[in-house]
């Protein structure tokens, strides 16, 4: 649960001090509560250590981790459509006339409310790591929408949260393209065997290469034809493998076994100690990876 699978990275755009003790009280006002009978979705904070602690924050070495939980009611479109059509047909038969569009629209709301109490729920959890030393916030998710939703919850809890996506000086796709074209990457990194290339033109093609030597004539032809690398699988220090995306997101993080086993000497029964040790280890490695990536990709944009 703790080891992040993806990273959406954000920069605190103003100097603000985030302290776990203060955050604990602020998050408490927005703890997770399940959906009521008429709620489509609910989101709130839960302890990052799950049932092992009531604390809504966990902190070590200037790093804070928090966890958001979301419940969404699942109402498949065909189910809504079927119930709505049945209701429309009954009313039209009873009244001997065709219903207007506005009447049908209001009926749809009625149908939704009648179905909600019987709908299944889908639950998801999103971890967020706040690096107070480097002024960064990382969200463990693969989509900007999910990250923004979680940041919005934090903003609401704290009162304000001045953050922007981490921006780099040079377009990421141009740097990734040059790495593949030349076969030379930034120090500490190594090309793996997977990439996605897109044509610069909107209606151009997309090439997805898997299990393939990227420094090859076949790939070079696509680059010469004007395609740019938008996703690239990389290895860092033989410790972490990941896919770098042109939007700045880091996906499919895979920590090497040696790294993950580093805290194996800690008794697994002592969940709190193991969680703390893994958290310190993971955040230390990922902070170093992010710094190396930013430098390797040409540096952070001036703020």
From Swiss-Prot:
Localization: Cytoplasm, Nucleoid
Which cysteine pairs are covalently linked by disulfides here?
none
CC annotations in GO: bacterial nucleoid; cytoplasm
Predominant subcellular localization, coarse grouping:
cytoplasm
Q: Does the keyword Cytoplasm apply?
A: yes
Has keyword Cytoplasm?
yes
The record's family statement is: Belongs to the RdgC family.
HAMAP family per record: RdgC (MF_00194)
Entry's PANTHER family?
RECOMBINATION-ASSOCIATED PROTEIN RDGC
- Please report the name of this protein according to its UniProt entry: Recombination-associated protein RdgC
Could you tell me which species this protein originates from?
A: Salmonella newport (strain SL254)
Phylogenetic placement of the source organism: Bacteria, Pseudomonadati, Pseudomonadota, Gammaproteobacteria, Enterobacterales
Give me the gene this protein comes from.
rdgC
